Every structure is written in structure tokens, then in C-alpha cells.
A protein has these predicted regions:
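N-terminal Rossmann-like NAD(P)+-binding subdomain of aldehyde/semialdehyde dehydrogenases
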Residues: 1-105, 132
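Short, well-ordered beta-strand elements within core beta-sheets of diverse protein domains
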Residues: 13-19, 259-261, 317-326, 341-346
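Flexible, glycine/charged-enriched surface loops at secondary-structure junctions
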Residues: 22-26, 90, 166-173, 248-255, ...
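Rossmann-like NAD(P) dinucleotide-binding subdomain of oxidoreductase/dehydrogenase enzymes
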Residues: 85, 93-236
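ALDH superfamily catalytic-core signature
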Residues: 120-139, 158, 162-165, 205-317, ...
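C-terminal core of ALDH-fold dehydrogenases
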Residues: 328, 333-429
Length: 430
């Protein structure tokens, strides 16, 4: 099918999905999870083809993003079941107003309609996005990167089998066969056919959507995430958090990319950092972190001299930009200049410094004494997320079910007319 045909088919799925009750949607998600596991062999074979084709062209870290395993497939099915267990967002009354004239006005959550997701080489996004869209009563159109197409196609075939078993339209979940820039542009300009576009990818993709999209678009920005170690930090805690934020999974958007350290503790902290992230990892046979150091940090430990652009780089790799700052205000200013407004953390025992940091850092998630790696729908108790929004309107931070709905006002009356016989009951007359 062409992109236009897929878009038209998705429009036809809007009404059945909008009318589906929670039990129907939950049964569909369970059937999709069962079908996903049943198709494990086919999905893993397809994934191996993707890995074979990508090997030598992308880094080992990016290959890890692309790779599927039986354990990861089990986690994907578990994620779908977790979405099924969440309350149905559709039909929730967000606000109720009873007017003096007897009108009952309810601000009610309703499905978005058709949600398009452009993403790159993370096949697990396929099942996450489909589960969230179905539970939120919307059809979803998926456009993955070419490196992951075989994997995503096999996953979507399984999900559509689950939809058929649950008697919901299989076109509620569709994958574009075209992975070119042209297909992405087609989604960006599909006015009247796409109700919401969510790009999940690198800076180039996000910029293209912001500049070219004529349909509503939510930015799920790149993650230049910062950790600031304050002079009042517990330095052992700080090393633990920095290690986790950088090395637990460096290829994801909530991984730390820049470390800022207060000048008063730099001489004590940097040797601890190097021992843990560089020497200790090398001794354990793990990839050491390449430290890109500003001049003050380089005077204390060895590393790579930091270039100015390093502090604006999302490495998605075992690399970390490091700078020394004078105080918490200097850290806040550095973050304001270089942040992508995703996730930032302060490590401190000083409540005043923590309050200043959380009030002044303008990012979707701001942590005190915790790793930025918690910026995730599941970790927030929202279920799997469609992405992490770095903008301020409609959605900000991990986008769960509530953020995938819009709302309408439903008004119940008993014959009221404006300026008519009931006007004397109203608190407003023209």
C-alpha cells in the first residue's frame, strides 16, 4: 500500500477505536502481546537480517539499540500488558461545571484520532507506540528507519494478527514500507489525515519536523542531559549516579552527556571519577568512558581536550563532556546555554542549592540526587511512553496515555436557550 492508502485506511479505523470500550481495547492488547511472543522466531530472524546489514556501518552502541533478544521481546509483551492494566484515559471527565442555568459542562478526554510516529532504529518503539495508541483510542502509523525495517515489519505483522483476533481493524496499526525522507515528509504534510505527529530520533529528524510539518507535531528532543555535582554533594553518591547516568545504556536519550563539577570539590572528585569510569571499566573488560575535559578539569586528570562543540553534542556513546563551574548559578547558566531541555540532575545535600536548581533549570525533568536515566514512562509509573517531549505545550516529559488524548467539551442541557426563557438563571447575559 502507498502512504496515502495507509493514511486513508487509518482514517477508517478512527470510529471503531473511538467506540471501543476499555475491555475491548485491553483484550486487543493481550491478543497483541500473545501474538508477539508467538511470532518470536520470525521476529528474531528478521532482526538478525537487520543486524547483519547494519554491522560495520553503525557503532556497537547503536547495534545494541537495534538488537532484539528473547528477553527483550518478553519485555515488549510485558510492556503491552502493563498498558492494558492502566486506567482507560478515554471518557475521563477532566473538569465538570454546573452552570446556574442548569447546563452541565464536562471537559472530557477523547482520542486524538490518527497518530503518526517517525522513529529510527529501535524496534521496541513499535510495540510501545502501538499499545499506547490503541489504549488511547487512536490509530497509529509507524515509519521506522531503514536499519530496523525488517524487524519492525515482523513485529507489526504480529500486532495486526492480535488486532484481528480481537475484532478491531488491523489498519489501526500500520507500518510504512517506504523509509525514505520522502515518506517522512509525506507524514509531516498530511493535513486532515494525521492528527498528531511524534518524531523520535536525532537532532536532524526533530529539526526537519519542526521546520516542515504542517500537521500538529510534538518535539521529542535530543537528550544533552547534564549532571551537576555541587560542593555539598556526597561524592560517593555522585560517582554512583554519574556512572549509572552515563554507562547503564549510553545510546538512549536520557543518558548523561555532560558533567559539571563545583570548583571546590573538583580536585577530590575527578580522581574518583576517572578510577570508576575509565580505569575500573578497562580493568573489568568494559568500554572505558572517554572524558572530554575543559581546561580546569584537564589540569586535574587526563583525558581528551574538550572542543567548544562537545558541550552541544549528544554522543550516544561512551563519551562524556566535563567542565568545572564556580557555583550552582554557573551550572544553571551552562545548562541554559547547552541543554536540549530533556533531563538534568543536581547532586547535593544543600536544600537551598537544590531548590535553586530545580526552580531555574528549564527542562522537562529535573532531578535531585538521582540519575537522569529515570526519565522514562515506565519508571514514572505511566507505562511505556510514546516519547519524551521537550516542548512546553500539550505535553512535556514522558508522554503516556493522558498525553495521547485531546479533549472536548460535552454539554448537557434540558432545553436551555441563550437569551431565552432560561436567561434569567444564567450568570452571564449579553
Amino acid at each position: 500500500m502507498t502512504t496515502q492508502e495507509i493514511l486513508q485506511a487509518a482514517q477508517g479505523a478512527k470510529m471503531p477505536l473511538a467506540l471501543a470500550d476499555a475491555d475491548t481495547k485491553n483484550a486487543a492488547l493481550e491478543a497483541m502481546a500473545v501474538a508477539l511472543i508467538a511470532a518470536s522466531d520470525k521476529i528474531l530472524e528478521a532482526n538478525q537480517r537487520d543486524l547483519d546489514a547494519a554491522r560495520g556501518r553503525v557503532s556497537d552502541v547503536m547495534l545494541d539499540r537495534l538488537a532484539l533478544t528473547p528477553s527483550r521481546l518478553t519485555d515488549m509483551a510485558k510492556g503491552m500488558r502493563e498498558v492494558a492494566a492502566l486506567p482507560d484515559p478515554v471518557g475521563a471527565v477532566l473538569r465538570k461545571i454546573v452552570r446556574p442555568n442548569g447546563l452541565i459542562i464536562e471537559k472530557t478526554a477523547v482520542p486524538m484520532g490518527v497518530i503518526a510516529i517517525i522513529y529510527e532504529s529501535r524496534p521496541n518503539v513499535t510495540s510501545d507506540a502501538a499499545a499506547l495508541a490503541i489504549k488511547a483510542g487512536s490509530a497509529c502509523i509507524l515509519r521506522c528507519g531503514r536499519d530496523a525495517w525488517a524487524s519492525c515489519h515482523a513485529i507489526v505483522e504480529a500486532l495486526r494478527a492480535g488486532l484481528r483476533k480481537a475484532r478491531l481493524p488491523e489498519c489501526a496499526v500500520s507500518l510504512l514500507s517506504d523509509t525514505s525522507h520522502a515518506s517522512a515528509n509525506e507524514l509531516m504534510t498530511a493535513d486532515g489525515l494525521v492528527d498528531l505527529l511524534i518524531p523520535r530520533g536525532g537532532a536532524g529528524l526533530i529539526r526537519a519536523c519542526v521546520e516542515n510539518a504542517t500537521v500538529p507535531c510534538i518535539q521529542t528532543g535530543t537528550g544533552i542531559c547534564h549532571v551537576y555535582v555541587d560542593k555539598a554533594a556526597d561524592l560517593e553518591m555522585a560517582v554512583d549516579i554519574v556512572e549509572n547516568a552515563k554507562t547503564s545504556r549510553p545510546s538512549v536519550c536520557n543518558a548523561e552527556e555532560t558533567l559539571l563539577v563545583h570548583k571546590d570539590v573538583a580536585a577530590q572528585f575527578f580522581p574518583m571519577l576517572k578510577t570508576r569510569l575509565v580505569d575500573g571499566r578497562a580493568a573489568a573488560g568494559l568500554t572505558p568512558v572517554e572524558l572530554h575535559l575543559d581546561t580546569q578539569a584537564a589540569a586535574i586528570i587526563d583525558g581528551v581536550p574538550a572542543a567548544p562543540q562537545d558541550f552541544d553534542t549528544e554522543y550516544l556513546d561512551y563519551k562524556l563532556s566535563v567542565a568545572v563551574v564556580d557555583d550552582v548559578d554557573a551550572a544553571i547558566l551552562h545548562i541554559a546555554r547547552h541543554s536540549t531541555h530533556h533531563s538534568e540532575a543536581i547532586i547535593t545535600a544543600d536544600a537551598e542549592a537544590a531548590a535553586r536548581f530545580t526552580a531555574c533549570v528549564d527542562s522537562a525533568a529535573v532531578y535531585v540526587n538521582a540519575s537522569t536515566r529515570f526519565s522514562d514512562g515506565g519508571e514514572f509509573g505511566l507505562g511505556c511512553e510514546m516519547g519524551i517531549s521537550t516542548q512546553k505545550l500539550h505535553a512535556r516529559g514522558p508522554m503516556g496515555l493522558a498525553e495521547l488524548c485531546t479533549y472536548k467539551y460535552i454539554i448537557h442541557g434540558s432545553g436551555q436557550t441563550r437569551g431565552g426563557s432560561s436567561a434569567k438563571m444564567s450568570c452571564y447575559t449579553k
